[in-house]
Amino acid sequence: KVYKVGGAQAIAALAYGTESIPKVDKIVGPGNIYVALAKKAVYGFVSIDSIAGPSEILVLADETANPRFVAADLLSQAEHDEMASAILVTTSMELAEKVSAQTDAFVKELSRGEIIQKSLDNYGHILVAETMEDAIDAANSIASEHLEIVTANPFEVMTKIRNAGAIFIGEYSSEPLGDYFAGPNHVLPTNGTAKFFSPLSL
């Protein structure tokens, strides 16, 4: 059966049951902060997958990355909401500067520019590491929901990644592809919980 209902009220209906919606045993899937808090409140009455936070992306890049692609991918997450996180970790100061300039240019053109700007102001960061090993350490420490590896040797870098919800390899493996049709699923650990949680599975 399919019920057209959403938000915290849907979580309550599924957890406790109503006249028209039967009680369920497990609630899974992402939602906004109200859905996340509702899932936290009903945990114990029903099983849940996880309490997901705002969307996150970390792009791990070197000097070979295309700054327009990197900027676009960062903004693809920043547009979700004002609490979304978009982080670039790179070994190239030149790339960092170009990506910063490109994000500023893109924000002015986008319909959700105000939301994106607030997200970037609050949770957007560009980190420049001295070495790729330092950059990889930063990525593993942050343990982002989505990790893009845009380097000259992405498969080699991937072997050193321990903590990430989903990994996208190469400049043409854009994170939105995983959100909408190429990824195993859209329910991924956030807020550093990729260190000890896995994506939703059976």
Indicate where each model-derived feature is located:
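Short, solvent-exposed amphipathic alpha-helical segments in soluble enzyme
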Residues: E19, Y43-F45, D73-A78, Q102-F106, ...
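A conserved active-site cap/scaffold subdomain adjacent to cofactor or substrate pockets
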Residues: S50-N122, I126
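Short, well-ordered beta-strand elements within core beta-sheets of diverse protein domains
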Residues: I57-D62, L88, N122-E130, A143-I149, ...
